[in-house]
């Protein structure tokens, strides 16, 4: 194929209930004195959740006391059993909680309680959970196997490799940040999604694309030719 190609992002809907004030309310219910990180998604080996667990095992005792990790999701029972076994083997039961599947408002509540969402996947085409966390005002760590370089470009998260040694550096950075710094990152992330991915904006891009196809006038800037 050598014709025009339109590059249009996935649309992201901002739930009416989810705001920065909503996040502030949710934060009241997190474990006091601890930073909370989380994974939310389908439990499958491609997600590399174990690399977060291995990163946590690299923390010293004092650092470990300041962190909790929630694994949110279901899917592959054998993979979940493997993760649970690794948590037990590394003696991380006090720091890691398996929550199970959540949806609806509870999903946004749990995202809002996090200091950061962790996405260490080997590969993601888009990773819808990334913008869902950002609209909650939650910073995101995402691996280089995801397309989310904008996290570092807009200073609303981390886009790095998914090796445990790298992930533990991100975790240590999170542990050193105060709540106002984390909130500022989250505000920048929410603004990024509103500016580039909000569903009304994407609908406008689709409108402009079809207008160009029908009239051949005013080719949109998101249409590329080889």
Short names for language-model regions:
Residues 11:
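Carbohydrate-associated surface elements
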Residues 35, 39-58, 63, 69, ...:
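A conserved mid-protein helix/loop that constitutes part of the nucleotide-sugar donor-binding site
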Residues 81-102:
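Nucleotide-activated donor-binding/catalytic signature segment of Leloir-type glycosyltransferases, i.e.
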Residues 101-102, 109-114:
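Short alpha-helical donor nucleotide-sugar binding micro-motif in glycosyltransferases
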Residues 122:
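Aromatic "clamp/platform" in nucleotide-sugar-dependent glycosyltransferases that forms part
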Residues 139-143:
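Short hydrophobic beta-strand element within catalytic cores of glycosyltransferases
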Residues 157-165, 174-179:
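Conserved acidic donor-binding segment of nucleotide-sugar-dependent glycosyltransferases
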Residues 181-196, 202-208:
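A short, well-ordered alpha-helix in the C-terminal region of glycosyltransferases
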């Amino acid at each position: 194929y050598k014709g025009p190609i339109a590059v249009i992002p996935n649309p992201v809907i901002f739930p009416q209930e989810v705001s920065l004030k909503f996040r502030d309310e949710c934060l009241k219910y997190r474990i006091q004195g601890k930073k909370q990180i989380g994974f939310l998604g389908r439990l499958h080996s491609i997600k590399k959740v174990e690399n977060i667990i291995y990163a946590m095992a690299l923390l010293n005792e004092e650092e470990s006391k300041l962190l909790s990790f929630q694994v949110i999701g279901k899917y592959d029972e054998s993979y979940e059993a493997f993760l649970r076994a690794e948590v037990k083997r590394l003696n991380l039961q006090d720091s890691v909680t398996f929550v199970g599947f959540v949806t609806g408002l509870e999903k946004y509540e749990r995202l809002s309680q996090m200091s950061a969402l962790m996405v260490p996947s080997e590969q993601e085409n888009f990773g819808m959970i990334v913008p869902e966390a950002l609209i909650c005002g939650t910073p995101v760590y995402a691996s280089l196997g995801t397309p989310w370089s904008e996290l570092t470009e807009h200073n609303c998260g981390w886009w790095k490799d998914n090796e445990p040694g790298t992930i533990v550096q991100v975790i240590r950075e999170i542990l050193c940040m105060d709540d106002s710094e984390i909130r500022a990152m989250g505000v920048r992330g929410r603004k990024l999604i509103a500016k580039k991915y909000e569903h009304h904006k994407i609908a406008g891009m689709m409108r402009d694309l079809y207008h160009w196809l029908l009239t051949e006038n005013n080719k949109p800037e998101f249409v590329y030719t080889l």
